Amino acid sequence: MLEFEQGFNHLATLKVIGVGGGGNNAVNRMIDHGMNNVEFIAINTDGQALNLSKAESKIQIGEKLTRGLGAGANPEIGKKAAEESREQIEDAIQGADMVFVTAGMGGGTGTGAAPVVAKIAKEMGALTVGVVTRPFGFEGRKRQTQAAAGVESMKAAVDTLIVIPNDRLLDIVDKSTPMMEAFKEADNVLRQGVQGISDLIAVSGEVNLDFADVKTIMSNQGSALMGIGVSSGENRAVEAAKKAISSPLLETSIVGAQGVLMNITGGESLSLFEAQEAADIVQDAADEDVNMIFGTVINPELQDEIVVTVIATGFEDKPSSQGRKATSTGFGSSVNSSSNHQSGASAKEDSFSAHTSHSQSSESVNERSHTTKDDDIPSFIRNREERRSRRTRR
């Protein structure tokens, strides 16, 4: 179902809270990039690390418990530190309509304190979104186990959760990419999501979206996908939509999403046909009965560029794809093409795949051969054609 939302746009208050070393670093990089209409808060048990934060609000938690020396990679200490400093956290969150809590899972402060911070934010009535990373495989089993427990705690505390496995950074960078540049790629998922929502609710459009629309799609929805796609030139709408729904860093693909908030921003040349093209790409990739709320904004400064922002939620719980190399919605052009990628999106591709045994009939083999030629066609386009074919046969 495609809904058009029109009316007055109320400006909501957005706050981004970085918890622990990883969360603090993410906040610093977002501040360096430059963002408007967002308040940044840094929370840590390590007083020395907190001094390096560029956030306007800094909270040292668990001063009595840790004496400012950190959580020692113990999530239980991180949790108790946040509980000790609950009042300070509440004061910092006060007045927020939406709170992003970002942290690295696997250590002490981020893993233990971030779920407590998120729970406080949600209890105070803020729409609460978690953006967390899983540790690299080489960091060891103990850290992976702690991270898994932290992710589950975050799921229980937030409205929606976005998980970025650090191992996937290895798929989108080459061997010569500096480490800090690689981490910026992960931070971009958070930055683009926050920037996209900020723009959605702060800029009035021809077909308008407001904070109520964001809440409709993101409240109590579990896993989420947030993405922004930018393109220009021929097929710009289609290309921007593809980029928005295909981040190789995320554990969740858009396949099966039951709720989608989509905004298209373009110059005065943005046409109705282009808006329809972009919406079709997103709608066909999501669930057949998706609740899709759609908005457009005309920004003359963009000239030939189109920006597509997508927030997708309402996924059925699926086994974690932590061990898989990258998500796939049929695109992922930034991913190393030599890798063998598979994700939740590929579940819909299985009926088209060429994995057949030698005992199959010649008809099956012919079908496999035909499918192989179409391997470069995005799965959701093939799904769309299949649905249309079924409707025609009826």
From Swiss-Prot:
<dbReference type="GO" id="GO:0051258">
    <property type="term" value="P:protein polymerization"/>
</dbReference>
<feature type="binding site">
    <location>
        <begin position="108"/>
        <end position="110"/>
    </location>
    <ligand>
        <name>GTP</name>
    </ligand>
</feature>
<feature type="compositionally biased region" description="Low complexity">
    <location>
        <begin position="353"/>
        <end position="364"/>
    </location>
</feature>
<dbReference type="InterPro" id="IPR036525">
    <property type="entry name" value="Tubulin/FtsZ_GTPase_sf"/>
</dbReference>
<keyword id="KW-0131">Cell cycle</keyword>
<dbReference type="InterPro" id="IPR045061">
    <property type="entry name" value="FtsZ/CetZ"/>
</dbReference>
<comment type="function">
    <text>Essential cell division protein that forms a contractile ring structure (Z ring) at the future cell division site. The regulation of the ring assembly controls the timing and the location of cell division. One of the functions of the FtsZ ring is to recruit other cell division proteins to the septum to produce a new cell wall between the dividing cells. Binds GTP and shows GTPase activity.</text>
</comment>
<dbReference type="GO" id="GO:0032153">
    <property type="term" value="C:cell division site"/>
</dbReference>
<comment type="subunit">
    <text>Homodimer. Polymerizes to form a dynamic ring structure in a strictly GTP-dependent manner. Interacts directly with several other division proteins.</text>
</comment>
<feature type="compositionally biased region" description="Low complexity">
    <location>
        <begin position="328"/>
        <end position="346"/>
    </location>
</feature>
<comment type="similarity">
    <text>Belongs to the FtsZ family.</text>
</comment>
<keyword id="KW-0132">Cell division</keyword>
<feature type="binding site">
    <location>
        <position position="143"/>
    </location>
    <ligand>
        <name>GTP</name>
    </ligand>
</feature>
<dbReference type="InterPro" id="IPR003008">
    <property type="entry name" value="Tubulin_FtsZ_GTPase"/>
</dbReference>
<keyword id="KW-0547">Nucleotide-binding</keyword>
<dbReference type="Pfam" id="PF00091">
    <property type="entry name" value="Tubulin"/>
</dbReference>
<feature type="binding site">
    <location>
        <position position="139"/>
    </location>
    <ligand>
        <name>GTP</name>
    </ligand>
</feature>
<dbReference type="InterPro" id="IPR018316">
    <property type="entry name" value="Tubulin/FtsZ_2-layer-sand-dom"/>
</dbReference>
<dbReference type="GO" id="GO:0005737">
    <property type="term" value="C:cytoplasm"/>
</dbReference>
<dbReference type="GO" id="GO:0043093">
    <property type="term" value="P:FtsZ-dependent cytokinesis"/>
</dbReference>
<dbReference type="Pfam" id="PF12327">
    <property type="entry name" value="FtsZ_C"/>
</dbReference>
<feature type="binding site">
    <location>
        <position position="187"/>
    </location>
    <ligand>
        <name>GTP</name>
    </ligand>
</feature>
<feature type="region of interest" description="Disordered">
    <location>
        <begin position="317"/>
        <end position="394"/>
    </location>
</feature>
<dbReference type="InterPro" id="IPR008280">
    <property type="entry name" value="Tub_FtsZ_C"/>
</dbReference>
<dbReference type="InterPro" id="IPR000158">
    <property type="entry name" value="Cell_div_FtsZ"/>
</dbReference>
<dbReference type="InterPro" id="IPR024757">
    <property type="entry name" value="FtsZ_C"/>
</dbReference>
<dbReference type="GO" id="GO:0005525">
    <property type="term" value="F:GTP binding"/>
</dbReference>
<dbReference type="InterPro" id="IPR037103">
    <property type="entry name" value="Tubulin/FtsZ-like_C"/>
</dbReference>
<dbReference type="InterPro" id="IPR020805">
    <property type="entry name" value="Cell_div_FtsZ_CS"/>
</dbReference>
<feature type="binding site">
    <location>
        <begin position="21"/>
        <end position="25"/>
    </location>
    <ligand>
        <name>GTP</name>
    </ligand>
</feature>
<feature type="compositionally biased region" description="Basic and acidic residues">
    <location>
        <begin position="365"/>
        <end position="388"/>
    </location>
</feature>
<keyword id="KW-0342">GTP-binding</keyword>
<protein>
    <recommendedName>
        <fullName>Cell division protein FtsZ</fullName>
    </recommendedName>
</protein>
<dbReference type="GO" id="GO:0000917">
    <property type="term" value="P:division septum assembly"/>
</dbReference>
<keyword id="KW-0717">Septation</keyword>
<keyword id="KW-0963">Cytoplasm</keyword>
<dbReference type="GO" id="GO:0003924">
    <property type="term" value="F:GTPase activity"/>
</dbReference>
